[in-house]
């Protein structure tokens, strides 16, 4: 092999090796790019998942807060409505005095437990009615009593309040839910 041929052979080997190195470098560069792209995609997917999870958590927190505020507003509104309804019902008690009140008063007297009732407190309009049912008692008028009566034994050791106001007050926890149901049904 001559000098020229040796140089040509070395050049060919060098070019082949250079081509192989270049080819290997390009393959390695493509592999690195592919790995980097895959990692970037995984990071994007992971980030999107975390973001979606964070958004869902924030949405749940916002919704829970809104539900809590709505519940508080609803409770405050229902409480205010309950007070207004109670006052309205109380102010309407005088209608029970219209027709048949004398019988209602007698029924309230019959509900009293046996006792020596010495003091009877009634609405001023019921003084004569109370005197008929309790001839031996002190009859006292009190304008705050719409109807019914308060009785007590001598010395006040035992007393019974059987006024329309007190009866409504005792029945109110049972009446209110039914009234509210009727109101909501009409809405």
Swiss-Prot record:
GO CC annotations, alphabetized: proton-transporting two-sector ATPase complex, catalytic domain
What are the UniProt keywords, alphabetically? ATP synthesis, Hydrogen ion transport, Ion transport, Transport
Q: Which Pfam families match?
A: vATP-synt_E (PF01991)
Its Gene Ontology molecular function terms? ATP binding; proton-transporting ATP synthase activity, rotational mechanism; proton-transporting ATPase activity, rotational mechanism
One Gene Ontology biological process:
proton motive force-driven plasma membrane ATP synthesis
Question: So which domain of life are we looking at?
Answer: Bacteria
InterPro entries, from UniProt?
ATPase_E_C (IPR038495), ATPase_V1_Esu (IPR002842)
Known role: Produces ATP from ADP in the presence of a proton gradient across the membrane.
| Family, per entry | Belongs to the V-ATPase E subunit family.
Record's protein name = V-type ATP synthase subunit E
- Species for this entry: Geotalea uraniireducens (strain Rf4)
Q: Give the encoding gene's name.
A: atpE
């Amino acid at each position: 092999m001559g000098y020229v041929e040796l140089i040509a052979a070395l050049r060919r080997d060098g070019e082949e090796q250079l081509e192989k190195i270049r080819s290997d470098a390009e393959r390695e560069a493509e592999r690195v790019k592919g790995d980097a792209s895959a990692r970037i995609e995984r990071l994007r997917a992971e980030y999107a998942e975390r973001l979606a999870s964070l958004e869902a958590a924030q949405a749940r927190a916002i919704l829970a807060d809104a539900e809590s505020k709505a519940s508080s507003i609803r409770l405050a509104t229902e409480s205010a409505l309950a007070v207004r309804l109670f006052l309205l019902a109380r102010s309407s008690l005088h209608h029970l005095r219209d027709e048949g009140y004398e019988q209602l008063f007698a029924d309230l007297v019959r509900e009293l437990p046996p006792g020596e009732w010495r003091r009877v407190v009634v609405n001023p309009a019921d003084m004569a009615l109370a005197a008929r049912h309790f001839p031996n008692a002190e009859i006292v008028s009190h304008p705050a009593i719409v109807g019914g009566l308060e009785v007590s034994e001598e010395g006040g050791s035992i007393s019974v309040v059987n006024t329309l106001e007190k009866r409504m007050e005792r029945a109110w926890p049972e009446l209110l839910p039914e009234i509210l149901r009727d109101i909501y049904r009409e809405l």
